Amino acid sequence: TFTDMLEATPLLQSAMLRAMARMLRQSRPAKTARRPRVIGVVSNGDTAAAPMVDAIATSLDSHGRTAVIAPPVETTSAVQEYDELVEAFSETLDRAERSNDWVLVVADRGAGDLWRHYVSAQSDRLVVLVDQRYPPDAVDSLATQRPVHLITCLAEPDPSWWDRLAPVSHHPANSDGFGALARRIAGRSLGLVMAGGGARGLAHFGVYQELTEAGVVIDRFGGTSSGAIASAAFALGMDAGDAIAAAREFIAGSDPLDDYTIPISALTRGGRVDRLVQGFFGNTLIEHLPRGFFSVSADMITGDQIIHRRGSVSGAVRASISIPGLIPPVHNGEQLLVDGGLLNNLPANVMCADTDGEVICVDLRRTFVPSKGFGLLPPIVTPPGLLRRLLTGTDNALPPLQETLLRAFDLAASTANLRELPRVAAIIEPDVSKIGVLNFKQIDAALEAGRMAARAALQAQPDLVR
């Protein structure tokens, strides 16, 4: 029988077991629902991996048990056959997986192409240590089939790295970057997503101030319209104080919508808005932000939602705040981009699609209170009321056009139940009903509304501080 044959030929039995082990190892990276456990760390160019691996492992240790497999480069570079690596390291890797939460498998500089390929093949995710002096083509082709995180060493990498690898995230090679990467790997990376709302969006800065002062660590930011401005400011690495100071200077201090013109494409020229985003963000690229960021706009041509994750920060924010009829749209190739609030004023679903952690949502949808009131004008009216009656031809006091446009966004945007989305940790709802949607001078009231709402959320959910 076949069993007798195996017993009589031990070499055949051993060869079959090795072949089966190899087949199992090579099929291992199939997608599963569990958190990634084997993390490949691959050095590109002359970047030394060892000190960074130590920093990543130390950061991961605060979330669980971590093992490191980093054989000497003299050993791995001398290997001539891929099967030799499979046979030599399969048992070591399996044993490390069984006894740890994460295993870092390291391909340092000079480790050899076969070992780099083995690391890429066996990993659930890859961390690539980027040396800008070397092209991304040097990274193993299997890297394009895995979620990739970039650690940027020395100079910031150019966009060709994003073209090649489409990384999930990128981090600077410092303690903050290693901590953020570890939280992503552990599934504890907190995201903050913020709604649009005109001047009411200034409440986001108060929310962020209260959260960060309480010790909440946020790695990812996203939003629409005024939420995009706040998201980009925080992703830029500004602390709450600096972000609020910038908001006072570039938003509250300049009245960005006060450059009205003959309404051919919009009621305003958009020049003040351009200066706002340029003053805030300059020529920074999204790829070079130290924290995760996206903004949302809408393409007037196709009707599609556009999620901005690459390119100019100023361009992404400018598109997201281009209220149709009020601010001129942004022409981008074959796209004509306007305020994302038309389709998704609070893009929580976009943020929640990232499986690396929970999400805090800041929702500004409240009962609409027009800044100038509404209803029948009294029989005896003040000169401004008389002028309004003459211009509108009605005895009804109606909201200004700008407020009507912004409120229409609230009504048209998705009304998805935030509590039904996966990974929503908290919903913060500042009471901004008394703040005019275009009254940017009410920044102090908006900030306080944000702080109060965040304070209430922290009291209800103290576990947000982690």
Language model: regions and residue ranges:
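Glycine-rich phosphate-binding P-loop
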Residues: 35-62
